[in-house]
UniProtKB/Swiss-Prot annotation:
Entry keyword annotation includes Protein biosynthesis: yes
Xref: InterPro entries: eEF-1beta-like_sf, EF-1_beta_acid_region_euk, EF1B_bsu/dsu, EF1B_bsu/dsu_GNE, Transl_elong_EF1B/ribsomal_bS6, Transl_elong_EF1B_B/D_CS
Protein name: Elongation factor 1-delta
Similarity field: Belongs to the EF-1-beta/EF-1-delta family.
The keyword Acetylation belongs to this UniProt entry's keyword annotation: yes
Subunit structure: EF-1 is composed of 4 subunits: alpha, beta, delta, and gamma.
Function recorded in the entry: EF-1-beta and EF-1-delta stimulate the exchange of GDP bound to EF-1-alpha to GTP.
Keywords: Acetylation, Elongation factor, Phosphoprotein, Protein biosynthesis
Biased composition (Acidic residues): 149-168
Positions of post-translational N6-acetyllysine modification: K17, K107, K117
Amino acid sequence: MTTNFLVHEKIWFDKFKYDDAERSFYERMNGPVPGPSRQENGATVILRDIARARENIQKSLAGSSGPGASSGPGGDHSELAVRIASLEVENQNLRGVVQDLQRAVSKLEARLSALEKSSPTHRASAPQTQHVSPMRQVEPPAKKAAAPAEDDEDDDIDLFGSDEEEDKEAARLREERLRQYAEKKARKPALVAKSSILLDVKPWDDETDMARLEACVRSVQLDGLVWGASKLVPVGYGIRKLQIQCVVEDDKVGTDLLEEEITKFEEHVQSVDIAAFNKI
């Protein structure tokens, strides 16, 4: 009686099995890889690395064992073949250069022979003496056949003169030029040394006629003396002095002579001083 109600109840007694199956499914789909499969993947990675390393080693060995690095007989033969080919090319180039040089030399020889045949001096007779002048008189062929003795005499004639005559002519021209230069220099006027002098002419007192004093100073006339501007400069106590400019030639007029000539006018001139002296 107590268990009959269980017959009518709808209870899922196998639900845990379905839960376990669902959990295992999702674990396989999203969960960690099981131990055996993880080991298989690690072994696959190691094998792949080993294969990659072997491939790299083979590539490096193939690169180092090139044509230049071959040490066997085959490598030596290939190197010799390359060197022989380069030597053959150089030989051909040198042969072409030699042929070009030979052709150029043959052309030069032909041109020289043609020039020698066409030049008039080649047809002229050889000189009798070893010492010859730069140029000789060449006679026409008919005249040479008529008088061979005259040709020998003409060969001794120097149309341009000897070296001694040339030296004499050069010496004469040099002397002529020196003489002309000396004459030209003599005709050129010589430079005259001149000086500019500023004189201070002092009177006796303030009653001295300064116009008369200046007239007396300017009355001094000498060869090589030229008077210039003048002015009156006050000294003191109403006394003024005459300051006058003049230009003299040094060879003709001296300062002492000039002072003596001015101080001759004793009535007006007390003293003469040189205020400035400049060479021109």
